[in-house]
Amino acid sequence: MSDMFLPARMRKLKIITLDQYSDSVVRSLHEEGVTQIDDISERIQQDAEWRQILKPSRATPYTGRVSSLLMKTSGILDFLGSVAAEEKGLRDTIREFINPPIFEKREVEELDTESLIERAEETLGRVESETRVMEEKLNELDSERSAVESSLSVAEKLKDFDIDFSDLQDSEYITGIAGRITAENLPELRDKLADITDELVISDREGENKAERILIIVTLKKHADSIASVLRRMEFERFEISELQGRPSEIISSSKTRLEEISRERKEIISKLRDINAEWEDELLVLREQLEIEKERNEVFSLFGETRKTVMLEAWVPLKEADRVIAVVEESSEGTALTDLEDPDPEEVPVLLDNPRFAKPYETFVEMYSPLKYNEIDPTIFMAFVFPFFFGFCLTDAGYGIIDALIGFILYRGLGKVNNFMRNFGIIMMSCGVWAFILGMVTNGFIGDFFPRFFNITLPTVIPAIDAFVNPQNILIMALTVGVLHINFGLILGARNNIRLGNMREALGSQIVWLILELGIILYLVGGMIFGAPLIILAFAMLLYYNGLFGLMDVSGFLGTLLSYARLLALCLSTGGIAMTVNILTGLSYEMIPVIGVVLAPIIFVFGHIANNAFQSLGAFINSLRLHYVEFFAQFYMGGKNKFNAFRAERNFTKIRR
């Protein structure tokens, strides 16, 4: 099998450069973004021979300052962004989801670290001079609003009491307590307080409902602790009244007035901050990105080794990019760097998936399962064909397929413009929707039995033999046939992997044996015992030889794996069955419920099918993944531990001026 079905071929690149060119080399590699920097500092510390030549390098002295400025920039952006979002409505959110604003990359100069720090300090100083006072004022208003709302809440609960709260404040001799207790506990509370002292006054009113009572207790201060202890045991909810002055009605009136004033003041400040955000947001986004990139560049030096005048680093580079990377290093070091390209140890190589453009979105699914081993076959291309087909098989409804494809298109053309994950997910959903449409049209599924039930017509594209409502047994045969082909392809990949790696025993005992058993069963069914029996006996002998008695038990497990593909039929029928039920309820509502049925029927139809499509699409997605992860990958996927992490300058808002 050609290298196109394997992860990217990698090489280890060793670079030695003069210290004066190290920053230039790092910047060039960072902008190219096709290498992974390897950490050699730990190896230097552990290897005595290396320690004689090199010492571990350190992050640059600018790292701390750059990190601090980055945190400050992010904090200002988060603050201004949260303020700008306060007035954003649902319509704005939906509009941005469907058609998010695209940031036009700004050309920036390639600055050294010191120059970038100076520029950042200047920019942040100007922004903070405008925002600091308003931010402090906004925090003060928010704190005051919380306090006023708390006072208002207490005053409204005590509004039935004709009392001035200043009379309840602690004095030298008396103390006042207000709170809430359940009505059933009130008699017991009175008795327990009477046992403590008769030097107290208890006033009570009905609370928000008859099950609770609002109390005000006035007593001598010397009894305060004893009474407080009893109140805690009786689940008494105490109100904070120490800051209240005046009568409840006065506090309610003044609190509402003050809350309105606070709201107006906040709106004025937020309006000004929104203007500041509009003026500075782009500049701050650019600055944050530059600081993030600079931080990575300054930190990466801690992975290097160094001598008095040179720096050494090691990087993993895809073979097809190696010549270009070496040329970049030569140019950035003015020809003074030494480079050496080595064949790697397969156990150490970080794995980079390298697939055609159409299969790229499915790499996420493979990486979610486990990183590949360097020399095993990458199943991404096969998954790109089979996953959407399985999804469509599970859904088999053309109407739902159209909806899913439209959702995928909206994601692709909307958030996909600014988010790579959403772009990939949109592509996957469009592919899945297309397959659901195709399979739905040939199996008589279009919003359930919509056309036959309401228009008494049959879809012209239906193949009668696989009409899901008439011949479900044929759909089952299709599902199991697909399952056998899928599993066998996995077995072939597994055998190929093991043979490639020299594990012939594993290939014979775990993959080839099942292919022989299947061939024997087919020959037995077609030609009888004389043709099939020898291969069946050979397969069982191989199971015993390579796997012992447990190998015979694996037969039932293998059969269960094949039967797992019956879930394709189960989900296919459940989609159509529930859709048909929604259509039946829609028809009954329209025909049997006078007047209101005309309104109710469309509601049942729309929301019923939306819910069914949502649940069935989710089920189709999960079960398609499961058939790959549990059934297909189990036949061949070995998995590794090292994933390629590119040392790349992520530029979403900037581009270097050349």
Swiss-Prot record:
Key word Ribosomal protein present: no
Subunit structure of this chain's protein: Has multiple subunits with at least A(3), B(3), C, D, E, F, H, I and proteolipid K(x).
Summary of the function given for this chain in its UniProt record: Component of the A-type ATP synthase that produces ATP from ADP in the presence of a proton gradient across the membrane.
Keywords: Cell membrane, Hydrogen ion transport, Ion transport, Membrane, Transmembrane, Transmembrane helix, Transport
GO BP: any one term: vacuolar acidification
Coiled coil spans: none
GO cellular component terms listed in the entry, alphabetical order: plasma membrane; proton-transporting V-type ATPase, V0 domain; vacuolar proton-transporting V-type ATPase complex
Transmembrane regions: 383-403, 427-447, 475-495, 507-526, 530-552, 568-588, 591-611
Pfam family, one: V_ATPase_I
InterPro entries attached to this UniProt entry: V-ATPase_116kDa_su (IPR002490)
Annotated compartments: Cell membrane
Family label: Belongs to the V-ATPase 116 kDa subunit family.
Protein name per its UniProtKB record: A-type ATP synthase subunit I
Domain of life from the UniProt record: Archaea
Topology in membrane: Multi-pass membrane protein
The keyword Transmembrane belongs to this UniProt entry's keyword annotation: yes
Species name: Methanothermobacter thermautotrophicus (strain ATCC 29096 / DSM 1053 / JCM 10044 / NBRC 100330 / Delta H) (Methanobacterium thermoautotrophicum)
Molecular function terms, GO-annotated: ATPase binding; proton-transporting ATPase activity, rotational mechanism
